[in-house]
Amino acid sequence: MKIVESILNRSEEVVYRELQSIASDNNMKVFAKPRLSDVIQKDNTFLTQREFDFYTRSHCDFVVTDDGFRPVMIIEFDGPLHQSDEKQQERDQIKNELCKRAELGMLRINDRHVTKLYRGMTVLRWIVEVTELEKAFNEAQENGQIPWDEGCEAAASRS
């Protein structure tokens, strides 16, 4: 037995570095390869045997947390195998469903999300930052800092 050269392949390493940069700019943290059961806590929710086995044995590619280490979203890097392998697609569906039940956002990306630019930033950065802006906006509305009709007025004025 020997130690692996790296726990991340080259593509995952590129994603990790981009996520680290995004996280540092947004007061968040990034973790690579945590177990799904460390990110999503099982409650009384019924899981089939297949779902339970998957839940206890699988990992996430990346988890983004807030500064208090609470998971904000899972980022899955999908290489070509995810498009062509039926078994992999089944596993992806189970993970998607478990995240949905836990109300934890999941973003499935490929290499274009870290190589293509949109408005001067990677598509991955744009998606994460827009997601965080939406959360901050909704929080501000809930706290009474932004009127509830603010979002509606802006949309109506553009029509």
Which residue ranges define each predicted feature?
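A short, structure-level motif marking secondary-structure boundaries and short turns
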Residues: 1-4, 79-82, 130
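A structural signal for short, well-ordered beta-strand segments and their strand-loop junctions
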Residues: 29-32, 108
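Active-site metal-binding core of divalent-cation-utilizing nuclease and nuclease-like domains
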Residues: 7, 31-70
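Short secondary-structure junctions
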Residues: 22-30
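Nuclease catalytic cores
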Residues: 1-16, 20
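Alpha-helical scaffold elements within enzyme catalytic domains, especially in hydrolases
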Residues: 21-22, 98
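Basic, amphipathic alpha-helical patches used to engage nucleic acids or provide basic targeting signals
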Residues: 60-63, 68-121
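Basic, glycine-rich
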Residues: 4, 97, 101-159
